[in-house]
UniProtKB/Swiss-Prot annotation:
Record: residues binding Zn(2+): H657, C659, E681, C742
EC number of the protein: 2.1.1.14
Lineage per the UniProt record: Bacteria, Pseudomonadati, Pseudomonadota, Alphaproteobacteria, Hyphomicrobiales
Residues the record lists as binding L-methionine: I447, G448, S449, E500, D615
Name under which the protein is recorded: 5-methyltetrahydropteroyltriglutamate--homocysteine methyltransferase
UniProt cofactor(s): Zn(2+)
GO process terms (BP): methionine biosynthetic process; methylation
Family: Belongs to the vitamin-B12 independent methionine synthase family.
Entry-linked InterPro entries: Cbl-indep_Met_Synth_N, Cobalamin-indep_Met_synthase, Met_Synth_C/arc, UROD/MetE-like_sf
Species the sequence originates in: Chelativorans sp. (strain BNC1)
Active site residues of this protein: H710 (proton donor)
SUPFAM superfamilies: UROD/MetE-like
Length: 769
């Protein structure tokens, strides 16, 4: 039997030691040249190609690398560059590219000046499907034209060829490219498809002439709910591309199953089809029945989005009968691009040997596919020892006392509906809370964090290195906390926060104190551009060995007679921003986290903290891609929040916070959370996001953000008061709190002081009528 090819759809592009991050920041900071940045990028690409080849991949991608974002790259390649950036044709300057990604304070970025002197804004950024990666949203005009403005896909194919590696270039497909973008006039981007497809055909022709016999063309939107018109767009686009010749196309779908889009995908004139068989393992037989026999099927059987070792023996049992009859029809691949996992476990030093044996990062996942290919295609005995090693590690994991905690399982089995309900309705709770807190109309507060200055970061680093004692660090943090409390009192904020100076990250801070979590030193993944994150790993049952925030909350409360909020990260966000164990349903893991937080909430209340905030910025991010699957998710997500928050007395006030999002499709769930107060980002939308709350007649209190914490601009008090008057249109003034859009951790103190003073003044104006 011939060897079944091993393909990768994309790999992490940040480098083994985050070289891309540091190269970008040096360039943006004026510390290196364009040539030095491009040389660093070329080195990462070369290392990635070599790593994949050494790990056993026979089909290696090119053009999966990007300096910032692959969707932005596609927009630039196709000439979809908004007029504001000043591109007039020819080669696209690197600074124009970065202005689209990050905005620019420089007038030269767009070739003309602006009335406000603030340069040009970045394109909008949003989540890539249901992952924690962010992409830049392409913008189109109604009369948008496209042209081949960059030959990056061809150049990187040639670059790999010079290295002796024949690659399969990767392109984001035309229909997904348009669907992921937006038209400035609010029209349907798919109307632009007839103008776009010829440019794709031109690019594919150039790749063919360069020697690319196959091209991977990603159409992840095929796993979404589509209208018949949208399905027709796929047919139109790929019929047109097929008519022009060009290389063979491997149409890649991922993040779910084709579902009711299968007939459309099966009928497209493409040579290959990639399937996500991790998210949707049951679709394979239907695809094999529907697709032409000559269609190559890429089997996405290794999880490209999580870091757990694959059960190779189980996969062999499952795939053996399928590939046996026609091995030449199949390729083996990860479920999606490996962008979403760290690059290489071999450089990781932060996890113990046992836990390490349960993990697989990008390189190891390619190695797993190579083992699978050998076992399916050749003599299994040649790799049997490696298969056995994986099976032993999985068996140890399944039976480990580190993973399974009977006490946690017992608590979950004893859950009752009453545990997820407050003892009194909101109307009664509000009266009791007002008696306790005695707050004015339009009460003011902040979302939680205050600026993490260089001094705070230096003290944390010094403590971590042993250069500053724990006692010294604790004293420093207490000093910062007291300054924050005193300053909030001086300007007249009503419900205070302690500032969170002791916290490095809103998820990491808590997960470091919970059982069942582990942390890496080199497990970096790209969030966007140069921003990299190290998601914690949930490997076992989650519990809280001891209180996590009570000492800091009670210290801050001891400094003032005003209420100080206890600050927690909610269970859904703790789940969404972690690598989650794959041996339990996600909702079960979330309930475990909810119980740990429930204990913390109870301890805060017992310690005299009367206002407790449980942030859930990731609640909407967890929504399944398919509409039919969303109600079940929202049911357990809301239940977990309520499990965490409902064990308190009615006079204890529960707050939550959600970041910038569309709320229309989840407003029922937000109301069902039954938080006494919700704060949301609304300033950038000029309170437009409140429409959903007005239409729903949202019953509880709400704090619409009155200034954008992402901007250094400090709006005057009158402007904030105007926003609050807009909020009054449709909301009862008694419902309205006054707060910023989000936490202030990344801002400078000079900005924060003026902004919050103006915010307090705006609230005073509202009280005065």
């Amino acid at each position: 039997m011939s060897q079944i090819p091993v393909a990768t759809l994309g790999v992490p592009r940040i480098g083994r030691r985050r070289e891309l991050k540091f190269a970008l920041e040096a360039y943006w900071g004026g510390e290196s040249s364009e040539g030095e940045l491009l040389a660093a990028a070329a080195k990462i690409r070369a290392e990635n190609w070599s790593l994949q080849k050494a790990a056993g991949a026979s089909i290696i991608p090119s053009n999966d690398f990007t300096l910032y974002d692959h969707v932005l790259d596609m927009a630039v390649t196709l000439g979809a560059i908004p007029e504001i950036y000043g591109w007039a044709g020819g080669a696209v300057p690197l600074d124009t590219y970065f202005a689209m990604a990050r905005g620019s304070q420089e007038r030269e970025a767009c070739g003309h000046s602006h009335h406000d002197g603030t340069g040009v804004p970045a394109l909008e950024m949003t989540k890539w499907f249901d992952t924690n990666y962010h992409y830049m949203v392409p913008e189109f005009d109604a009369d948008q034209t496209f042209r081949l403005a960059s030959l990056k896909p061809v150049e990187e194919f040639d670059e790999a060829k010079r290295q002796g590696i024949h690659t399969r270039p990767v392109l984001l497909g035309p229909v997904s490219f348009l669907k992921l973008g937006k038209r400035r006039d609010g029209g349907d981007p798919l109307e632009l498809l007839p103008r776009l497809v010829p440019v794709y055909a031109e690019l594919l022709g150039k790749l063919l002439r360069a020697g690319a016999d196959w091209v991977q063309i990603d159409e992840p939107c095929l796993v979404l709910d589509l209208t018949e018109r949208e399905r027709r767009a796929f047919t139109i686009a790929y019929d047109a591309l097929a008519a022009t010749g060009g290389p063979k196309l491997m149409l890649a779908t991922y993040f779910g199953g084709l579902g009711d889009n299968l007939p459309t995908a099966a009928a497209l004139p493409v040579a290959g089809l990639h399937l996500d068989l991790v998210r949707a393992p049951d679709q394979l037989q239907d695809v094999l029945s529907a697709a032409p026999e000559e269609r190559v099927i890429s089997l996405g059987v290794v999880d490209g989005r999580n870091i757990w070792r694959t059960d190779i023996a189980a996969l062999l049992d499952r795939l053996g009968p399928i590939v046996k009859g026609n091995p030449g029809r199949f390729q083996l691949a990860p479920s999606c691009s490996l962008l979403h996992v760290p690059l290489d476990l071999s450089i990781e030093t932060g996890v113990d040997p046992e836990l390490r044996s349960w993990l697989a990062f990008a390189v190891q996942k390619v190695e797993e596919l190579s083992i699978l290919s050998h076992a399916l295609s050749a003599d299994r005995s040649l790799v049997q020892s490696l298969i056995d090693m994986a099976s032993r590690a999985l068996a140890v994991r399944a039976s480990s006392t580190r993973v399974n905690d009977p006490h946690v399982a017992g608590r979950l089995s004893a859950v009752t509906p009453e545990m997820a309900k407050r003892s009194e309705p909101f109307s009664e709770r509000r009266k009791l809370q007002q008696e306790r807190l005695n707050l004015p109309a339009f009460p003011t507060t902040t979302i939680g964090s205050f600026p993490q200055t260089a001094e705070v970061r230096q003290a944390r680093a010094a403590c971590a290195k042993g250069e500053l004692s724990e006692a010294g660090y604790d004293g420093f943090l207490k000093g910062e906390t007291e300054k924050a409390i005193r300053w909030q009192e001086e300007i007249g904020i009503d419900v205070l926060v302690h500032g969170e100076f002791e916290r490095n990250d809103m998820v990491q801070y808590f997960s470091e104190q919970l059982s069942g979590y582990a942390f890496t030193k080199q497990g970096w993944v790209q969030s966007y551009g140069s921003r990299c994150v190290r998601p914690p790993i949930i490997f076992g049952d989650v519990s809280r060995p001891q209180p996590m925030t009570v000492d800091w909350a009670t210290y801050a409360q001891s400094l003032t007679d005003k209420p100080v909020k206890g600050m927690l990260t909610g269970p859904v966000t703790m789940l969404q921003w972690s690598f989650v164990r794959d041996d339990l349903p996600r909702e079960t893991v979330c309930r475990q986290i909810a119980f740990a937080l429930r204990d913390e909430v109870s301890d805060l209340e017992a310690a005299g903290i009367g206002v407790i905030q449980i942030d859930e910025p990731a609640l909407r991010e967890g929504l399944p891609l398919r509409e039919a699957e969303r109600p079940a998710y929202l049911d357990w997500a809301v239940e977990c929040f309520r499990l965490a928050s409902s064990g308190v007395k009615p006079e204890t006030q529960i707050h939550t916070h959600m970041c910038y999002a569309e709320f229309n499709d989840i407003i029922d769930a937000i109301a069902a959370m039954d938080a006494d107060v919700i704060s949301i980002e609304t300033s950038r939308s000029k309170m437009e996001l409140l429409r959903a709350f007005r239409a729903f007649r949202y019953p509880n209190d709400i704090g619409p953000g009155v200034f954008d914490i992402h901007s250094p601009r400090v709006p005057p008090a009158d402007e904030m008061a105007d926003l609050l008057r807009k909020a009054e249109d449709g909301l009862d003034p008694r419902q309205i709190w006054v707060n910023p859009d989000c936490g202030l951790k990344t801002r400078k103190w000079e900005e924060v002081r003026f902004a919050l003073a103006n915010m307090v003044e705006a609230a005073r104006q509202m009280r005065a009528g």
